[in-house]
Amino acid sequence: MFGCLVAGRLVQAAPQQVAEDKFVFDLPDYENINHVVVFMLGTVPFPEGMGGSVYFCYPDQSGMAVWQLLGFVTNEKPSAIFKISGLKSGKGSQHPFGAMNLPQTPTVAQIGISVELLENLVQQTPVANAAVSSVDSFTEFTQKMLDNFYNFASSFAVTQAQMTPNPSEAFIPANVVLKWYENFQRRLTQNPLFWKT
């Protein structure tokens, strides 16, 4: 039903089932892992109205399990990338794995998936900094930056009659800035990563 992927390692497609609705993947040598991908294999969908909350578990200094909510996967969102590199020293959160006696090894962390009602999933708050930036947030930032630049540059616009001659200053016509702004917006809409080419 689930898979787990860490860059440079083989895909894990057979989690340990620790309860009817709970699954765990071991992450050996977790200190050297920055991101983890959790995904549905596409063979068995979630039952109607269900999804899977995804947790990261690592042993603290005393060897006790610290669980942190990363996010969730659903039939509509069957995969997610999580950044775990900054979470290895944070506080734990409420989790459904509490009563289970899962073995803890100092160098092995775990990814836990708990099958739950969708209405419960959307009410949970993942630990900060677990989500990887998406194209949507980048696109939103770029759009706000464009708007801010255009508004700033436009606030200095003057008519030719209002210009004071100054041979040491260059002037850019406002229609050139507007043309650039519209062109950049169009390209961003077509391909948010166009600037990489």
Curated annotation (Swiss-Prot):
Disulfide bond annotation, renumbered to this chain: none
Keyword annotations: Cytoplasm, Nucleus, Protein transport, Transport
Entry annotated with the keyword Protein transport: yes
Subcellular locations according to the entry: Cytoplasm, Cytosol; Nucleus
GO molecular function annotation: Hsp70 protein binding; nuclear import signal receptor activity
Pfam families noted in UniProt: Hikeshi-like_C, Hikeshi-like_N
The keyword Cytoplasm is assigned to this record: yes
Primary location group: cytoplasm
GO cellular component terms, A-Z: cytosol; nuclear speck; nucleus
Example GO biological process: protein import into nucleus
PANTHER family tied to this protein: HIKESHI FAMILY MEMBER (PTHR12925), PROTEIN HIKESHI (PTHR12925:SF0)
Functional note: Acts as a specific nuclear import carrier for HSP70 proteins following heat-shock stress: acts by mediating the nucleoporin-dependent translocation of ATP-bound HSP70 proteins into the nucleus. HSP70 proteins import is required to protect cells from heat shock damages.
Membership in a protein family: Belongs to the OPI10 family.
Protein name: Protein Hikeshi
Protein's organism: Gallus gallus
